[in-house]
């Protein structure tokens, strides 16, 4: 096997931790000696051993003189687990091949420095692009302390997310809906507006055995969420957060929600609407590193104007709804000129069942507003 193949194996291993390691990164490691893999591992779950230590634990023989391929710079600090650099040095591994650099201020080159000072050869940035693709959530969160937000919606080929009556089940096919369940497993949080809750009474959980459900976040300026909604009734089972902005006549409602297991966050702007940027800071402080935004057109518009959306994923179905009254993915007042559009960059287009998924990065540009419209 080649160096590239060993690192590809490490990447493959890292992906096994998808959805379980947040807010930690996904990491894989492969230990090679005399052209043979003698140990491999990955970070399985937040709070548990890191990839390098799991790889060392799986060794079939001494690692003295071996090479370890790891997708992310080894840690060098004591956190929930001991430093991986110490374990590498103790095992007398002679060479470390690293994919991604760790922007965590507690690491950020210090791990490499410690290894080199111990006489270990270090190769950096090997297949870095491929390794970086593993952890967009982690890289964003560790440097900003706010969640990486992906706006997701399903629409018809003529750009409708619902008919003129508001009906939307189902736009996409079963395969696309299964992929959305997988996406929910990947993210720490899922966010919707009160309009979606009142119209659809959704659970916003994961319905596939073996996958985890994200923290459910509802943007509800005036705290209109019904205590008998599915989200509130299941809050003891699935962590639920309701963000609100208007304190008028809400004291009793808040007590009821808290009794039922719902957490609340008060984050108003000067217009008594939810300040989305502040909400992201508050959610980040709770350890939420990523959010799947499954909002309607109003919340999507507000999120884009607030500048919190980093990526857009659109599932497009081969059907047409028509009608000027049909709901669209992004509402609000819109822009006056094409030059004012939110610019996107295609990153992937693929077919899932009968539907197409389009993934785009949001291009950085001047952000203007941080408040929600009335929700």
Residues covered by each model-derived region:
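Zn2+-dependent cytidine deaminase-like catalytic core
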Residues: 31-130, 215, 241, 246-248, ...
């Amino acid at each position: 096997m080649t160096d590239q193949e060993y690192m590809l194996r490490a990447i493959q291993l890292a992906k096994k931790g998808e959805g379980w390691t947040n807010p930690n990164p996904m990491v894989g490691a492969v230990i090679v000696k005399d052209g043979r893999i003698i140990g491999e591992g990955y970070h399985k779950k937040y709070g548990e051993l890191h990839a390098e230590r799991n790889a060392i634990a799986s060794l079939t023989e001494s690692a003295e003189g071996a090479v370890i391929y790891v997708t992310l710079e080894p840690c060098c600090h004591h956190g929930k687990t001991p430093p991986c650099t110490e374990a590498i040095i103790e095992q007398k591994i002679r060479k470390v091949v690293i994919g991604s650099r760790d922007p965590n201020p507690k690491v950020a080159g210090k791990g490499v420095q410690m290894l080199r000072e111990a006489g270990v050869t270090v190769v950096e940035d090997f297949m870095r692009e491929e390794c970086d693709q593993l952890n967009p959530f982690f890289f964003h969160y560790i440097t900003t302390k706010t969640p990486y937000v992906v706006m997701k919606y399903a629409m018809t080929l003529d750009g409708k997310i619902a008919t003129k009556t508001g009906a939307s089940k189902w736009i996409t096919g079963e395969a696309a809906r299964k992929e959305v369940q997988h996406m929910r497993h990947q993210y720490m949080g899922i966010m919707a507006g009160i309009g979606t809750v009142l119209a659809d009474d959704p659970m916003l959980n994961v319905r596939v055995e073996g996958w985890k459900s994200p923290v459910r976040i509802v943007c509800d300026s005036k705290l209109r969420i019904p205590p008998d909604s599915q989200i509130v009734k299941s809050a003891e089972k699935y962590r639920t957060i309701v963000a609100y902005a208007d304190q008028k006549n809400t004291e009793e409602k808040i007590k009821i929600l808290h009794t039922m297991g719902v957490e609340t966050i008060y984050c108003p702007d000067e217009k008594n609407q939810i300040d989305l940027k502040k909400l992201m800071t508050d959610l980040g402080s709770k350890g939420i590193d990523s959010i799947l935004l499954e909002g309607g057109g109003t919340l999507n518009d507000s999120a884009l104007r607030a500048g919190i959306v980093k990526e857009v994923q659109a599932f497009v179905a081969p059907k047409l709804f028509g009608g000027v009254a049909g709901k669209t993915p992004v509402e609000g007042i819109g822009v006056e000129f094409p030059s004012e559009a939110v610019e996107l960059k295609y990153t992937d287009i693929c077919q899932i069942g009968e539907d197409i998924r389009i993934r785009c990065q949001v291009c950085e540009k001047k952000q203007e507003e941080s408040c929600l419209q009335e929700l």
